[in-house]
Regions:
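Binuclear metal-dependent hydrolase catalytic cores
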Residues: 1-157
Length: 157
């Protein structure tokens, strides 16, 4: 069973040469989950040879730019690469509006469907499959902010 985390970026809001805004990639049995999507996330994905098509779930912790401003670029890259599978985006109130408004104003129609999942509470179960469960943990920040707990399920022998 594979379960690991790759740090694509961990820099603060200010840009620094050689450091990138927040993004982490969780690999669970070759299923990739992206946590946050700061600017340059796609560059880091290319550097680490991460195929975009393997990401079906994106979790955004909060709406400070260093955690989500790379998301629209990634959404459009998925489209340009011919993605047809649904994409699930989990985030706080307002994220759906941000993405929807950008799609409307650019008169863009995606090849795939985005499903928005609103994070509303602490200890909320966001995702579950046969291997893992993903829960929220409320963080102490100036605006609503959530951490994500990826918990492996017990294997039956």
């Amino acid at each position: 069973m594979t379960f690991d985390v790759k740090i694509l970026g961990c820099n603060s809001a200010s840009f620094a040469f050689g450091r990138h805004h927040t993004a982490q990639l969780v690999n669970n049995n070759q299923n990739l989950f992206l946590i946050d999507c700061g600017e340059a996330t796609q560059i880091q994905m290319m550097r680490h040879q991460v195929r975009h098509s393997r990401i079906d779930h994106i979790f955004i912790s909060h709406l400070h730019g260093d955690h989500y401003l790379g998301l629209m670029g990634l959404v459009f890259t998925f489209h340009l690469q011919g993605r047809s599978e649904d994409l699930h985006i989990y985030g706080p109130a307002g994220l759906n509006d941000i993405i929807t408004i950008q799609l409307q104003h650019s008169e863009s129609r995606l090849n795939y469907t985005i499903h928005f999942h609103l994070i509303e509470e602490n200890d909320q179960l966001l995702f579950e499959n046969e291997d893992i469960q993903v829960y929220t943990v409320q963080m102490n920040h100036r605006i609503p902010c959530y951490g994500f707990v990826f918990e492996e399920k017990q294997r039956k022998h």
